[in-house]
Amino acid sequence: MTESRPCHKLKGIQAFRGFAILLIVMSHVVGRGFAFGGESGVCFFFVMSGFVLSMANDEKLRTGKFQTMRFVFHQLRKFYPLLALSLSFFVFAYWHAGYPVDYGKLLTNLLLIQTWFCSRHLVFSYVGSSWFLCDILVFYLFFKPLNRCIIGKSVKSLVLTWVAVVVIYAPFVFLIPSERFNYTLYSFPLFRLIDCCLGIALYRFVMSGEGERLSEQMDKKAYGWQSLILVVLLAFCLAFFAYRDVLPVNFRGVSFFWPFAVLFIFSGSADFSGW
């Protein structure tokens, strides 16, 4: 692999980060009629996390200076105080409204383990969005070995591994009842690790000789590629709305977005001169 790209390469991804945020916000504003926004935006964020963390920590990982627990505590300091404050507010609001405090829900929220139980009573309890923090924390804990495994594998081994993952994942898509989608495929930490690993694998490709050459070719025809990506983005949105009632939620809620997330993040990392 080539040497690490400058950090300014991450700037191109910011546009898609903003797009993902907009999708998630719209899903909460509109409600169930725009579930597409939350499902796709969350997928983009998980894949993006794998890619961005790999790029930002590339040198530390290569030199052995990356320390998992120091990294995890650094990340916790960023969001845990606000989470604790929000949780306190909601618990007090529920108590003030006459609802008894559910100490089981409170404890799982404080420990960020609510998504491990696949329970509709726990996953979105109190601070509903904290389920994402639970899953991303799991990724932080396993980031170093996952990165080492994916970056260090041969292309053949990596392809075979991904085939095995898809083969193992597919039965869950067909067997899990659709009404349990939100508490299993959508939020269970081990399932969402797949999204994050896609981001790491994408980073591996971007840093490879093939990825560099493709990025250079795209940069030479920046406006053409921008137009193509915008067309794909529009087609992506239109196709989803046209077929959302046909596709089962277990498929369209997560894995449907994987190829689109990879495409958009790769195009952002190309850092076109015209952007």
Language-model region placement:
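Membrane-cytosol interface segments of multi-pass membrane proteins
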Residues: 1-174, 179-180, 221-223, 227, ...
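Transmembrane alpha-helices and membrane-interface helical segments
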Residues: 52-56, 136, 140-144, 148, ...
